């Protein structure tokens, strides 16, 4: 089957060459203006731009490059990508996943029969959707350019791919060593000459295809030595590379905040052709904490007539790229004819572009330099509005039907490439397994896993991050809302697809858990009809728990999500506002401390008002997390859950810290004021919030992997109040275990009085509780300096306990309860000063056994330690019974370590410590 289709593909390619002799001979418009090798053409950039805009020239390549470091997308995701590209009027897909081993590391290996059929299916699907499929290969890691066998191996590999039906190719020499081996140095005068030589040879061997891309090793401004205009490497590329070959370029930097027109004119001049932009603005493979959901930005539509194309290299997570690709399409369509800005005339009154310009002029204060034809904020609104529809529809890639417009898509062995495993008895979803092109026999895990990215391979710019200037929320005019609604409705009406039938069924209040595909695993019961569902629907009684109904994701949720995960160099307006508010609350917290001298009621009111507003913003994040976790489209959820989980966790800590700042009695201004500005890169918005907490270096507490199965449950950590005492005592009593159960029911408060009573009474400033929907389920208590705390206990707490519990007779054998009572009447041992100098703070923590989420304990410990360090603590310790294995393990998982025995330590306890 493979050989038959390959022969047909070769015949088809030969007929295309005969029908287009100009393409076969390599003659093109670019060749007619590009200088001959070795000639100098100072006006080359302008000539390329003119030819690029002329009628009949090669089309502008605009689409997606799968070129990130990380697990490649699977075949069904790529087919879904083709559908979206066609829908949004984009035209190109470049296959270049760095971690597909046959693309880069083991580029010499040929594809197996199974892999070949998958590639043929993919190329055929791209053709059906009218998407140009460009196959890229990266031999630069270890190829010997002067070895004819190596060149023949590369030709044989690309010849195999061409037999699959591929017509467009790319040779990539990015992210490799500049040094040549000894054999190459004898043949080639420079690294650039070696690369250009093999690229030209491969290009001619393949029949000079219409689209052939070359990625230089100096692929951005910062990689050029000494600079772009004087780079010998780029000059060689411009002079020696055949004019029919296009050059990829990422802009001034690897991840370019902006790509100025002047920078493109500069590089076009030296490479003697307009480049194709490989855009990393939405790439997130260099930071495992970051996701980019902001709009395509920082690239004027004035670039379009000066380029041969733009290919965005987006997030590693496929479903997280809806906004990135959608806004790129909006950018491209705003000037897809390549019209120069100085000749742009007013569009017709009913055009989308005209309406967008009107809206931006009337209701926005966006930067003055905003493109006349393209508004990033409007493009983001349009993308999020359309993306919202996807969250209510379960994704089942393998069941999607494509409209045939030409060659038929092959099916491997008649089985879908991605199975749909059942996560539980009622929900059936498709788990997306991210793998390179592999044989069908490859083992697949049966459960969804949280995807992690490779360690940093590309270093973005080390420069400060700008925040988006917060826009004042103004009431939009009614006619503006109507116009926006009409735009979205018109777009949706024009772009109906097979999924829309599912949307209609969802609109009829059909539970998403009942949606099931025909190709699901056989032991799952078939889907019931609406009539059967109505007959068998359970109706709870008046005293029974009502049916659970999940709130749908809202447009406001997606806007908040985009603001929290915006772009590499800036946070969205809401994210920037939250960061500024937390920084202000932190720096001005001294005004609300109880012992603050010269209190200013106006400043106190301002602080509490802004704190309340900040807590409301944190609540919006929690609500967004809950609704997203319950959405019907589990495919989107799985791709983004780890990021949303991370921001939810850090915002929970930050909210608790702000609440603590507002109710403590001691001022910590000396520690909190005077930090540097919070502009940084690593970790995105969550990382910046972490750096503003006192224990920013406690990375183990901030590392909170999400659960294997997504959950929408949210816990609240807040400061302890006296009314919580009974609940904390109850947890303390229930979790205490001496091996035989609780033996003294007649004294229910005894354990609480012994373990937590003193801290709750005398150290309120450093006490937190954990809550869920049923009430308090955990506590974290501490005192910043145990020495004065013990003195206070001797004055007030111990006498009260001695009065409450009579000293038992020590002549007889004492029960466990009597031993505890006796401890109140005995002299307390004092820990050595040498130990307390490094670990001055005492902590006690416990969580009810019903709480199974391990991240909750880390968050509680982070809140407690933040409050202690904010008041100058260098370290904390806890005392644990040697036989209490559960609590020993509990503290160990929270970063506490056993302190070596020293003189003065109690003999009946183990002391664990943690440095701050």
Curated annotation (Swiss-Prot):
The keyword Nucleus applies. The keyword Phosphoprotein applies. It is an enzyme of class 3 (hydrolase). Changing residue 878 to S: No effect on O-GlcNAcase activity. Induction: Expression in the liver oscillates in a circadian manner with peak levels at CT8-CT12. The active site is at 175 (proton donor). Its EC number is 3.2.1.169. A protein binds at residues 67, 98, 174, 219, 278-280, 285, 313. It is found in: Cytoplasm; Nucleus. One of its GO terms (molecular function) is hexosaminidase activity. The modification Phosphoserine is found at residue 364. Pfam families: NAGidase (PF07555). Disulfide bonds: none annotated. Keywords: Cytoplasm, Glycosidase, Hydrolase, Nucleus, Phosphoprotein. Residues 1-46, 443-465 are annotated as: Disordered. The record marks 413-414 as: Cleavage. It catalyses: 3-O-(N-acetyl-beta-D-glucosaminyl)-L-seryl-[protein] + H2O = N-acetyl-D-glucosamine + L-seryl-[protein]; 3-O-(N-acetyl-beta-D-glucosaminyl)-L-threonyl-[protein] + H2O = L-threonyl-[protein] + N-acetyl-D-glucosamine. GO terms for cellular component: cytosol; nucleus. InterPro entries: Acyl_CoA_acyltransferase, Glycoside_hydrolase_SF, Glycosyl_Hydrolase_84, O-GlcNAcase_cat. Residues 452-461 have a biased composition (Basic and acidic residues). Monomer. Interacts with CLOCK. PANTHER family: O-GLCNACASE, PROTEIN O-GLCNACASE. Belongs to the glycosyl hydrolase 84 family. Cleaves GlcNAc but not GalNAc from O-glycosylated proteins. Deglycosylates a large and diverse number of proteins, such as CRYAB, ELK1, GSDMD, LMNB1 and TAB1. Can use p-nitrophenyl-beta-GlcNAc and 4-methylumbelliferone-GlcNAc as substrates but not p-nitrophenyl-beta-GalNAc or p-nitrophenyl-alpha-GlcNAc (in vitro). Does not bind acetyl-CoA and does not have histone acetyltransferase activity. This is Protein O-GlcNAcase. It comes from Mus musculus (Mouse). The lineage of its organism: Eukaryota, Metazoa, Chordata, Craniata, Vertebrata.
């Amino acid at each position: 089957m493979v050989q038959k289709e390959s022969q047909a593909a070769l015949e088809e390619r030969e007929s295309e060459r005969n029908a287009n002799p100009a393409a076969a001979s390599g003659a093109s418009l670019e060749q007619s203006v590009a200088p001959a090798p070795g000639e100098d053409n100072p006006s080359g950039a302008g000539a390329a731009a003119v030819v690029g805009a002329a009628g009949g020239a090669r089309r502008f390549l605009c689409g997606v490059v799968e070129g990130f470091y990380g697990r490649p997308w699977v075949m069904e995701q790529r087919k879904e990508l083709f559908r979206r590209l066609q829908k949004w009027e984009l035209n190109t897909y470049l296959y270049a996943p760095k971690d597909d081993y046959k693309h880069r590391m083991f580029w010499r290996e040929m594809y197996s029969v199974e892999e070949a059929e998958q590639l043929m299916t993919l190329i055929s699907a791209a053709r059906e959707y009218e998407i140009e499929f460009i196959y890229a290969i990266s031999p630069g890691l270890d190829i010997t350019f002067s070895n004819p066998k190596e060149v023949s191996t590369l030709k044989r590999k690309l010849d195999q791919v061409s037999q699959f039906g591929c017509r467009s190719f790319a040779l990539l020499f990015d992210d490799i060593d500049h040094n040549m081996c000894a054999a190459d140095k004898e043949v080639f005068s420079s690294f650039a000459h070696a690369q250009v030589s093999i690229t030209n040879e491969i290009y001619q061997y393949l029949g000079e295809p219409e689209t052939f891309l070359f990625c230089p090793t100096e692929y951005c401004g910062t990689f050029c030595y000494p600079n772009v205009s004087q780079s010998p490497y780029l000059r060689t590329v411009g002079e020696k590379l055949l004019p029919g070959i296009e050059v990829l370029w990422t802009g001034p930097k690897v991840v370019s905040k902006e790509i100025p027109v002047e920078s493109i004119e500069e590089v076009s001049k030296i490479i003697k052709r307009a480049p194709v932009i490989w855009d990393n603005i939405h790439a997130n493979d260099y930071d495992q904490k970051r996701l980019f959901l902001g709009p395509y930005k920082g690239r004027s539509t004035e670039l379009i007539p000066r380029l041969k194309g733009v290919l965005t290299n987006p997030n590693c997570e496929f479903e997280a790229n809806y906004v990135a690709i959608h806004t790129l399409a909006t950018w491209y369509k705003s000037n897809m004819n390549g019209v120069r800005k100085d000749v742009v005339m007013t569009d017709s009154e009913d055009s989308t572009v005209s309406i967008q310009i009107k809206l931006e002029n009337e209701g926005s204060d966006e930067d003055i330099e905003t493109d006349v034809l393209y508004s990033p904020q409007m493009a983001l609104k349009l993308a999020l509005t359309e993306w919202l529809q996807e969250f209510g529809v379960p994704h089942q890639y393998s069941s999607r039907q494509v409209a045939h417009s030409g060659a038929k898509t092959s099916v491997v062995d008649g089985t879908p490439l991605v199975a749909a495993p059942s996560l539980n008895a009622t929900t059936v979803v498709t788990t997306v397994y991210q793998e390179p092109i592999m044989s069908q026999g490859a083992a697949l895990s049966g459960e969804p896993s949280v995807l992690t990215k490779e360690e940093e391979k590309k270093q973005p710019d080390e420069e400060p991050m700008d925040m988006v200037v917060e826009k004042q929320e103004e009431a939009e005019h009614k006619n503006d809302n109507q116009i926006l609604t009409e735009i979205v409705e018109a777009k949706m009406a024009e772009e109906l697809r097979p999924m829309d039938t599912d949307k209609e069924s969802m609109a009829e209040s059909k539970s998403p858990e009942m949606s099931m595909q025909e190709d699901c695993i056989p032991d799952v019961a078939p889907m019931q009809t609406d009539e059967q569902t109505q007959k068998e629907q359970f109706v709870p009684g008046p005293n029974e728990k009502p049916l659970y109904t999940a709130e749908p994701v809202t447009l406001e949720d997606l806007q908040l999500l985009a603001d929290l995960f915006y772009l590499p160099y800036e946070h969205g307006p809401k994210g920037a506002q939250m960061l500024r508010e937390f920084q202000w609350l932190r720096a001005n917290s001294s005004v609300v401390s109880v012992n603050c001298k010269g209190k200013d009621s106006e400043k106190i009111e301002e602080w509490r008002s802004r704190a309340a507003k900040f807590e409301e913003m944190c609540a919006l994040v929690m609500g967004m997390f809950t609704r997203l976790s319950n959405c019907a489209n589990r495919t989107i959820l799985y791709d983004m859950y780890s990021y949303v989980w991370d921001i939810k966790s850090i915002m929970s800590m930050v909210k608790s810290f702000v609440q603590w700042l507002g109710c403590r009695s001691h001022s910590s201004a000396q520690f909190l004021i005077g930090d540097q500005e919070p502009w940084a890169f690593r970790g995105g918005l969550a990382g910046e919030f972490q750096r503003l907490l006192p224990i920013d270096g406690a990375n183990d507490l901030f590392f909170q992997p999400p659960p294997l199965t997504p959950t929408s449950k949210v816990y609240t950590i807040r400061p302890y109040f006296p009314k919580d005492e009974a609940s904390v005592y109850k947890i303390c009593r229930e979790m205490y275990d001496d091996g035989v159960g609780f033996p003294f029911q007649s004294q229910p408060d005894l354990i609480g009085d012994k373990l937590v009573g003193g801290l709750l009474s005398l150290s309120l400033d450093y006490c937190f509780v954990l809550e869920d929907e049923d009430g308090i389920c955990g506590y974290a208590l501490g005192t910043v300096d145990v020495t004065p705390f013990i003195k206070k206990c001797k004055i007030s707490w111990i006498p009260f306990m001695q009065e409450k519990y009579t000293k038992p007779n020590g002549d007889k054998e004492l029960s466990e309860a009597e031993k505890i009572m006796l401890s109140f009447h005995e002299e307390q041992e004092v820990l050595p000063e040498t130990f307390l100098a490094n670990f001055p703070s005492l902590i006690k923590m416990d969580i009810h056994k019903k709480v199974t989420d391990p991240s909750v304990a880390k968050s509680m410990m982070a809140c407690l330690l933040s409050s202690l360090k904010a008041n100058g603590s260098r370290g904390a310790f806890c005392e644990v019974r040697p036989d209490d294995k559960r609590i020993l393990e509990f503290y160990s998982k929270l970063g506490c370590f056993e302190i070596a025995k020293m003189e003065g330590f109690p003999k009946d306890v183990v002391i664990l410590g943690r440095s701050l």
